[in-house]
């Protein structure tokens, strides 16, 4: 009560009216402060225990933003700065990119159309600029693919995945010791088996040799799929897939030593399952790629 009235009255007057001595007042004030500190510390420990459950489950892959998203119900009333402070004080930092990664590139062929690139003219400067359009309104409108190399003590593995631009989910993938055309066919066959009706889909890739093979182009054409290519030497035209490779390598590859190809393959397969089913994103409203996809597909079915 005294502390609340100190804005209007001097401490001397308040102590005289209350009958408290200054040492007694100082003692109670100190005790009140210590109790508040104790309660705050206990609450910090409770918050930390929740954070650790998520942080350890996701193998140190989550920074404070994803931690907040994963614990949005448990920590609904907690300020994000407090969570960030607790994680910083306990050295809980999400993995950050440290190494550059390089997608495997086959030999380029002739130039092809980029269906995701649109020209716009600036009204003031009248200059033409190119704008990439990765936006989609529903699943299976735009897919993208690429190949990336993973090394271990025993040799190399190549990952060839297909990603849906709508939700970031990995539709299909193949892991091989050689980035050959057989790998591309296995990947395509898995995707087509899962989704037989893909008429109108835009399927994007770089200008790798495998994507310019006549059989590959016929597979797409027979399904009514429109093929799209990145411009030569422009990795940003396929930045969604490049970003996926970067995230994957940062979270399960860099900093880990794999002795055998079998060990590396197992880690890659487990990560793709984790990425699809557990790795949440702010862009996907706190859902994993497959959870967001299933939600969207369910809404589409209900609308019919």
Could you describe each region identified by the protein language model?
Residues 26-136, 234, 290-297:
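Basic, flexible linker segments flanking DNA-binding modules
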Residues 221-225, 247-304:
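C-terminal domain-tail junction helix/linker
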Residues 1-8, 13, 30, 304:
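Residue-centric detector for conserved, function-critical "anchor" positions
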Residues 14-15, 25, 51, 67, ...:
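Mobile genetic element proteins and their domesticated derivatives, centered on retroelements
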Residues 103-107, 205-207, 213-217, 227-249, ...:
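RNase H-like two-metal-ion nuclease catalytic core shared by retroviral integrases
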Residues 141-150:
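Two-metal-ion RNase H-like nuclease active-site motif
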Residues 152, 164-165:
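Short, acidic, Ser/Thr-enriched surface-loop or helix-capping motifs
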Residues 151, 155, 174-196:
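Active-site beta-loop-alpha junctions of metal-dependent nucleic acid enzymes
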